[in-house]
């Protein structure tokens, strides 16, 4: 089954304690697509400026990512420059130049208008709502958001919650959105407003899946070397949604497996700058990492009672 993603396509310049990279592929749509393409066909909708090195995106086409939804506009592309110190959970933004992204009005090609799965990446909730008006209702609609939209577009974000099946956000954003300090209470608050599933990400501490009264925790993979955490959350989402699209299994068991595949893809993303590692990782490496995750939490001790 296909996945449609609407998100940013950017150029990132990143500094970490382990090196730096200039003008490399970035953006939520880019990271999601690179990750999800390991599982299913992906349709990407975004915008780039006339200065964007479009040839760099061609590698994604070879991985079953349809780029015909990328709009090219006159002007500068979206650029972000950030720095991570030894706390890799938070980036210091040094520069943000929205360029043509500030004028982005997603136009869904007719060939993309009946997706099986839809991921509304981190963009203005007004645009996310507009996308929903342009497509036939997918089997599953997921969205991401961030603190900026929670502060500046709260009414629209709350409206969006009534139209999606799944929300992904980090723990700080969950607390900010719901004004609840407890994440279990925060997830219930969100589900009361429409979504059936809530994924709360905690960076290097893993992620929670909330579904009805069930809670599942996926640990983060313990890596010795982390080069660039910039796209980890979007790579997680790509693995998660991509796996669901490949299997079509939206049961509790299917969702839990998808969480592990998402965590696996997020762990690969941080091993190199940009989408470099996501483009080279093999099917066998992905499956081995999933097996490693299972080993992380497996134990054979019989439980009393």
Where are these regions (language model features)?
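Extreme N-terminal starter segment of soluble prokaryotic enzymes
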Residues: 1-4
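Conserved N-terminal subdomain of the carbohydrate kinase-like
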Residues: 11-23, 38-120, 132-138, 287-305
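Alpha-helix C-terminal capping segments
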Residues: 33-42, 243-245
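Short beta-strand scaffold segments in enzyme catalytic cores
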Residues: 34, 80-83, 206-210
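Short, conserved phosphate/pyrophosphate- and ester-handling motifs at nucleotide-, phospho-/glycolipid
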Residues: 36, 170, 233
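A short acidic, amphipathic alpha-helical/loop segment
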Residues: 56, 127-134, 155-159
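Conserved phosphate/ATP/ADP-binding segment of small-molecule kinases
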Residues: 138-140, 147-217
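Conserved phosphate-binding/catalytic region of the ribokinase-like
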Residues: 183-305
